[in-house]
């Protein structure tokens, strides 16, 4: 290119053409202040081959009066056709780079200086940056094409020039004296390597300072995965199993690695920060963050695994955004392979997402690669984020933990526990979730839709709506080593090899998942929408007079302040009236005025949707609501009987709602809640008896509304036990009982107008039945048929007649007694 007058002529024409658009300047250090020795030859070192970078350098040298890089240079008897070289050599005719070779020009210059003591040469490292630094750029469009650590193709370089070329910056660094390198007397080859290493470190440090650190491990890690012993073993087994060459199995493992691995770039993080800052301000009234300081304290020296609840696709972006804004490293995020869509998938991958298939079953090679990838992240200290619920909660409840990722984490820690692992629960609460209407359709029976790139237009359409505030609460961290010490005290003394899979692993992983879920619920953010939904959905007509709703909300706020659920739970500011105004402003309340005042109600469109927001905080009200429900049919109860019934029901409530208290803590909490209910006038204490208010009183209405928040859960319990008792011992399997429960719930929801599709959620019945088995109330026989404890009927009726209306109990018993007819009716 520059070795003949013709090539120099072509290069000059190219430079002039380039500068019809490009504008460049020198940054940091003036080219005139380089303290060059003009009597000695000058060479320019560019990091990698780029004709446009060379043209910009030539332009800046001409402008500054420096020697031009495209002109010949002489060092003693050595005559070089041009005064520049690329630290990374030009590719060969097949496009391959020789990573080990040194630039020929550098080798010849060092040899010339070594052979002639009077000769010297100066090498000036030069970096060309297209556009502003990512930290300074505010345009998301320009950030997409900003300089990064990734290797770019010709098309992307052309787009970069077109979009960012008007702000091109050139950095001249202090010259390196070749004579100083030669005087170390290391020999020619070692001197060349030393010069290369010196410039590589220089270019890397400068690039880090200008565009941010290289936080991607993809380029090196993926190739390293296939050399890990467990992956090599899986490759060999795959080759034998499929009767294919080992090289083909290795190529398959590499494809899996590239499919999985994230490709973090600082520019992508900055792009997302700029876009999301605009997005949050456009769609939300603000983001409230609580307790992040404890994460800032434990992050140094720990492998941090963020385990947020999962309510929206925005969860992926929101947490990374907040961590980045608060000076913490954004995590590598586990995302379903369904999100690896064109355009969106690439952006998420550069923002830290790594993709995983929904199931690993039947693919041991993929399993080995994925496990090794996560193990590498953990042992190298990269923060990681995954959702223990697996998918997004469509009901607003905490879903039962899926323990796959926890099991991988636990086994990785047993392989190498040098870096302490700490789980950080993160509760993300929305006053209005973006996918709310989609969830509503799915709750009503619509099939789950596959994600599509066109879903982004739905988000754009949502920009016109008001979504309130977002609350992000960081919960109590869980130190994995301490958890294992508690669950398996002797784990440190066991032989922990790479293939170590102890007998206690599954049970311990399940307990870990439950602990994470409880810690997430402890960090719940109670917001105005939650409380309004809780109050109105407890009424028979989904409506209350405004003054009555204000009293209910004031009561709930007072109770939660008197008996806090946990130190990590947060409450909304303001009184009941302020909460109503806030929710009204979000168009979630309908109203009707008359001469007596204003009635607030939920219309049909919002009634089901509001069950989602009620369920967010149902666990917080479960215990006081249970206590209140015992006074539905009983005017007075003793403390001992209350405690007996609460202890009997608590294991099932705890399993469904992930309540935080251990059974031995229950009596103290019961007393705290009873004292709070007495203080607010909802109960009256007479010696060891607790007495409800008069049915005609306002306090009785408040007590009844509080009790109704847990009624549907208690109804499901009674349905399952009634079906079981009517069927008889060892008649139904767990699966058959589960199906019958769903059918009965669907029928009762129609008969009693329960407008809550999650009432007949199959997973809730499944988990209740599992808990009955774990508690020893149910006993599967050899054929999987369920037998039950002799006292089950007595206990179920004793509780039900106190917490459920006679009409509802009769309906449940009738449907249970004639379940064949119920089955026929449900099918028809």
UniProtKB/Swiss-Prot annotation:
Compartment(s) of residence: Cell inner membrane
Membrane topology: Peripheral membrane protein
Keyword Lipid biosynthesis in record: yes
Pfam entry (one): GPAT_C
GO CC, one annotated term: plasma membrane
Domain comment as written in the entry: The HXXXXD motif is essential for acyltransferase activity and may constitute the binding site for the phosphate moiety of the glycerol-3-phosphate.
Family assignment from sequence similarity: Belongs to the GPAT/DAPAT family.
UniProt-recorded name of the protein: Glycerol-3-phosphate acyltransferase
Lineage: Bacteria, Pseudomonadati, Pseudomonadota, Gammaproteobacteria, Pseudomonadales
Gene name, Swiss-Prot/TrEMBL: plsB
């Amino acid at each position: 290119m520059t070795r003949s007058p013709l090539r120099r002529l072509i290069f000059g024409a190219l430079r002039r053409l380039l500068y019809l658009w490009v504008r460049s300047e020198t940054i940091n250090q003036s080219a005139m202040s380089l303290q060059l020795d003009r009597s000695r030859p000058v060479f320019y070192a560019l990091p990698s081959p780029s004709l446009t970078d060379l043209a910009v350098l030539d332009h800046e040298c001409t402008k500054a009066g420096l020697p031009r890089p495209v002109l010949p240079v002489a060092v003693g008897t050595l005559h070089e056709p041009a005064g520049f070289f690329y630290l990374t050599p030009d590719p060969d005719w097949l496009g391959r780079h020789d990573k080990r070779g040194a630039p020929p020009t550098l080798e010849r210059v060092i040899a010339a200086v070594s052979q002639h003591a009077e000769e010297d040469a100066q090498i000036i490292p030069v970096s060309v940056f297209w556009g502003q630094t990512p930290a300074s750029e505010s345009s998301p469009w320009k950030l997409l094409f900003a300089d990064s650590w990734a290797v770019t193709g010709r098309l992307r370089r052309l787009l970069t020039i077109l979009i960012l070329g008007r702000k091109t910056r050139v950095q001249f660094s202090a010259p390196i004296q070749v004579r100083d390198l030669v005087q170390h007397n290391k020999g020619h080859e070692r001197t060349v390597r030393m010069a290369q290493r010196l410039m590589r470190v220089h270019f890397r440090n400068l690039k880090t300072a200008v565009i941010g650190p290289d936080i991607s491990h993809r380029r090196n890690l993926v190739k390293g995965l296939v050399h890990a012993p467990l992956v090599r073993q899986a490759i060999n087994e795959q080759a034998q199993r499929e009767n294919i060459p080992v090289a083909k199995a290795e190529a398959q493992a590499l494809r899996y690695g590239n499919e999985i691995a994230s490709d973090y770039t600082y520019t992508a993080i900055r792009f997302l920060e700029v876009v999301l800052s605009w997005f949050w301000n456009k769609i939300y009234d603000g983001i409230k963050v609580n307790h992040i300081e404890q994460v800032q304290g434990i992050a140094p020296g720990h492998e941090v695994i963020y385990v947020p609840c999962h309510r929206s696709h925005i969860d992926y972006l929101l947490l990374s955004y907040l961590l980045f804004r608060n000076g913490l490293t954004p995590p590598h995020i586990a995302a379903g392979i369904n999100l690896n869509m064109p355009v969106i998938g690439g952006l998420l991958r550069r923002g830290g997402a790594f993709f995983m298939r929904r199931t690993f079953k039947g693919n041991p090679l993929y399993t080995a690669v994925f496990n090794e990838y996560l193990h590498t992240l953990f042992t190298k200290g990269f923060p990681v984020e995954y959702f223990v619920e697996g998918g997004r909660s469509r009901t607003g409840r905490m879903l039962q933990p899926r323990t796959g990722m926890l099991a991988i984490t636990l086994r990785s820690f047993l392989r190498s526990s040098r870096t302490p692992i700490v789980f950080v629960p993160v509760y993300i609460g929305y006053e209005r979730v973006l996918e709310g209407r989609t969830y509503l359709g799915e709750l009503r029976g619509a099939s789950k839709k596959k994600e599509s790139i066109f879903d982004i237009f739905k988000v754009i359409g949502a920009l016109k709506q008001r979504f309130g505030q977002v609350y992000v609460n960081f919960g109590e961290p869980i130190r994995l080593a301490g958890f294992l010490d508690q669950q398996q005290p002797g784990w440190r003394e066991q032989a922990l090899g790479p293939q170590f899979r102890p007998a206690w692993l599954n049970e311990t992983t399940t307990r870990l998942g439950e602990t994470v879920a409880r810690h997430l619920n402890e960090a719940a953010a109670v917001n105005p929408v939650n409380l309004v939904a809780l109050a109105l959905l407890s009424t028979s007509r989904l409506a209350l007079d405004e003054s009555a709703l204000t009293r209910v909300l004031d009561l709930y706020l007072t109770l939660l302040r008197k008996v806090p659920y946990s130190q990590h739970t947060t409450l909304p500011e303001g009184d009941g009236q302020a909460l109503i105004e806030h929710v009204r402003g979000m168009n979630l309340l309908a109203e009707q005025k008359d001469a007596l005042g204003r009635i607030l109600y939920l219309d049909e469109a919002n009634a089901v949707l509001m069950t989602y927001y009620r369920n967010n905080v149902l666990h917080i009200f479960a215990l006081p609501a249970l206590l209140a429900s015992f006074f539905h049919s009983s005017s007075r109860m003793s403390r001992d009987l209350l405690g007996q019934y609460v202890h009997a029901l608590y294991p099932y409530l705890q399993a469904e709602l992930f309540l935080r208290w251990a059974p031995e803590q229950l009596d103290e909490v019961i007393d705290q809640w009873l004292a709070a209910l007495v203080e607010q006038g909802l109960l009256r204490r007479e010696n060891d008896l607790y007495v409800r208010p008069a049915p005609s009183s306002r306090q009785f209405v408040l007590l009844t509304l509080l009790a109704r928040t847990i009624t549907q859960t208690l109804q499901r319990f009674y349905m399952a036990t009634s079906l079981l008792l009517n069927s008889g011992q060892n008649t139904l399997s767990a699966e058959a009982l589960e199906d019958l429960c769903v059918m009965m719930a669907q029928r009762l929801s129609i008969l009693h107008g329960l407008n809550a599709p999650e009432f007949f959620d199959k997973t809730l019945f499944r988990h209740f039945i599992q808990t009955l088995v774990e508690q020893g109330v149910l006993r599967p026989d050899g054929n999987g048929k369920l037998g039950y404890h002799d006292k089950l009927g007595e206990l179920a009726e004793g509780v039900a007649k106190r917490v459920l209306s006679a009409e509802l109990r009769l309906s449940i018993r009738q449907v249970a007694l004639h379940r064949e007819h119920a089955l026929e009716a449900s099918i028809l």
